[in-house]
Amino acid sequence: MNKGKLYLIPVPIHNEEEFNSKFIPPYLTEEINKLNVFAVENIRTSRRFLRKINPKFKINDTTFHLIDKRTEEAEYSNIINCLINGNDVGVMSESGCPGIADPGQKLCSLAHHKNILIKPLIGPSSILLALMSSGLNGQKFTFHGYLPIEKEKRIKAIKKLHPNTGSHIFIETPYRNQKVYDDLIQNLKPDIRKLCIATDLTGINESIFTKKISELKQSNIILKKYPTIFIFE
C-alpha cells in the first residue's frame, strides 16, 4: 500500500471577516478539494475557511485532527497512522503557513521519520512578506519567534542581538505590540539600527514602514492591536 502525502496548506493571514479569494491560488483550492482529512490548529476556523473557498465542501464527510500545544502524542500517532494507511492529510495553521512557529512543525518531523512525502503548497507567509518589503537584509536573517513576555528578559534578548548579524525577525501577540515596540525603541542603538514594523499584512489596515531608531524616537507611534511582524538590523 502506498503511503499518503502530507499537504502543508497556507491560509489567509488577515482578519477572517476580510476574506478575499484573490489571496488563494486556484491550484490551492483544487488540492484542498481532494482532501477529506485535516490536521489543524483550530477546527472551527478551519471549517469556516474550507466553506469560504468552496461553499459545497463536504464538511460532514471530513475528519479533523486538532494539533495545538496541548495535543498528546497519541493524536500525532493517529495522524501518522492515517498517512501510513494511504490517506492524504492537509495541515492548516490558524493563520499563514503551517510548520513555522506552529504545531505543524512536529507533525512534519514525524512524517519525515516515517518517510512520508511532504508537499508544501504556495501561499501567504507574513514573515516573508514583511522581510521582502522591509528593505532590510534579505540575504542573512534569523526568525526568533516571540520575544520573552517578561520585560527584563525581553530587554536582555533585544540587547543580545548584534547589529552585524543580519535581520532579526519577531512576531508578537497583538495586545503586546506597544510594549515590544517601546522596548525596541528604548534599547536599540539609535544611530546604527533600523526597525521595520509590518502590521495586518494583506488586510485592509495593512501598514509597513522601516525607519532608523533615531527617527522613530522623534515620533509618537501608537500601534494598533493587529498581527505584527517586527524586523530590525
Language-model-detected regions and their locations in the chain:
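Class I SAM-dependent methyltransferase SAM-binding "motif I" and its flanking Rossmann-like core
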Residues: 7, 106-164
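Acidic beta-strand-to-loop metal/phosphate-binding motif
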Residues: 39-40, 90-96, 168-172
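A glycine-rich beta-strand to alpha-helix segment
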Residues: 82-132, 176-180
